[in-house]
Amino acid sequence: MKITYPSIDKLLSRVNSRYSLSVLAAKRAHEIQAGAPLALKHYKSDKAVGEALEEIAAGKVTIDPEHREDIG
């Protein structure tokens, strides 16, 4: 999959690594699919992952460094 919008450079300016970006986008996309409120009024993408990436690029979704999840 090739990301054309938002640009990967803009996305990586919001997070510290590609891994963090992929995890954040996947988690936010899952929330969107589960019915969470959207953070933007308008989206260019019609898919949850694209919407999540647009929210990250806009600075509406960030990583909470204090949040820890149980692995198993």
Swiss-Prot record:
SUPFAM superfamilies in alphabetical order: RPB6/omega subunit-like (SSF63562)
SMART domains registered for this protein in UniProt: RNA_pol_Rpb6 (SM01409)
GO cellular component: DNA-directed RNA polymerase complex
UniProt KW Nucleotidyltransferase keyword: yes
Catalysed reaction equations from the record: RNA(n) + a ribonucleoside 5'-triphosphate = RNA(n+1) + diphosphate
Cross-referenced InterPro entries: DNA-dir_RNA_pol_omega (IPR003716), Pol_omega/Rpo6/RPB6 (IPR006110), RPB6/omega-like_sf (IPR036161)
GO BP annotations listed: DNA-templated transcription
Subunit-level organization: The RNAP catalytic core consists of 2 alpha, 1 beta, 1 beta' and 1 omega subunit. When a sigma factor is associated with the core the holoenzyme is formed, which can initiate transcription.
Protein name: DNA-directed RNA polymerase subunit omega
Annotated organism of origin: Lactobacillus johnsonii (strain CNCM I-12250 / La1 / NCC 533)
Gene this chain is encoded by: rpoZ
